[in-house]
Amino acid sequence: MKPVLLTAAVVTASLLAACSAPVEAKPKAKAKNVILFIGDGMGISTVTAARIFDGQSKGMDGEEHELSFEKFDNLALIKTYNLDAQVPDSAGTASAMNTGIKTQIGKINVTANDNLGGCGDRSAPVKIADLAQAAGLSIGIISTARITHATPAAVYGHAADRGFENDTDLDKVAIKAGCTDLAAQLISSNANYVLGGGAKHFAKKREDGRDLTAEWSALSQDHVYVDNARQLRNLPATGKNVLGLFTKSHMAFEAGRDNNKEPSISEMTERAIQNLSARDTGYFLMVEGGRIDHAHHGTNAYRALTDTVAFADAVEMAVNTTDPEKTLILVTADHSHVFTIAGYPARGNPILGLVKKENGKTAKDADGKPYTTLGYQNGPNFRDADDDALTDKVVAGKNYLQQSGVHLESETHAGEDVALYATGPGSEAVQGVMDQTEIFGVITNALGLTSTD
């Protein structure tokens, strides 16, 4: 029996030793690609309303529905303030994400050392795109706004004034300093795949006489410019560096988009992924749903929600066409809006409709007038004597402007936190309450570009 007991003791000791030995942590997988989706102005109330709107369009009550990115594994709340502003603008918020540094309102990728009106290049911080290109990655930029607008411009440019989209926008100080406008900066940025609006800033409307679209095409045999959806579709999916500008200014809202002239945000995203993935170098792609913000500024909930749903569809397409082991996908907003969901409507009440009680009767305010579930704290459609004539058909129309509490020419941004949704390698860093500047570190660390240690 003794030999057997000795063997058992040895085995037991060996097992205990194995259990107490340190276990090597499995290294976290590095992302080959990162896609940053930014819903401009897509605050949490917008996500909620769009969720219900999309669900109701599919025959549900709506409240139980989920948009594509709401299924992601990781979630955080993001502080959005600018260096000098409690309620931010898109220039400051996009700069925070792209550089990890807060800027003053109205500035793109510059520090407080550059006053408005200067070039902004004396203190331009390093951008994600700079680090990515230095590491051999490709760069893609997609927006339904002008490609020189604040959010897309922050991927490739810097400006002490976000209004420097064209050389005609430069003030006397900027001209004297020899500043370069954002459209010209894009052409020299070495970006690989760029689609959006804003063609007017690249040719005929310029004082310097430059045709920047022709300059893009002249960069190499592989550089191509297109100006409508059919031209884009006729291009080979891979092998080209593409600049596509489909409208003079911003692209159309999704509710009025002509598919023969303008590709959808999903189609633009799909084409970008096909092109960038084929390079096999890895890529950083920023996709902006830029018109959500514009609809909110006009208190037009219908267009804000239809553009948000289109944006969510683009995210779903990206999830379905990328490798989840290699691609980090982030979805966030740059800021929120003073957009509310209120009034105790019954479950399943049309989100664009008048508030109805559980008994089906229309709710009335203290003056005996009906009111909508969706509204704005401020904006152009101040409540007036005509409110008692509102009907469900009127308020559900795509041109209806929601009621606002404070009369302003344009509705404003809001200062509350926005959400950040994440999936893929590196997404575990997205949790809790974070500053917007930390998105820079999430991306660069996932790609192995820098360390925040």
Predicted regions and their residues:
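Bacterial N-terminal signal peptides that target proteins for export
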Residues: 1-8
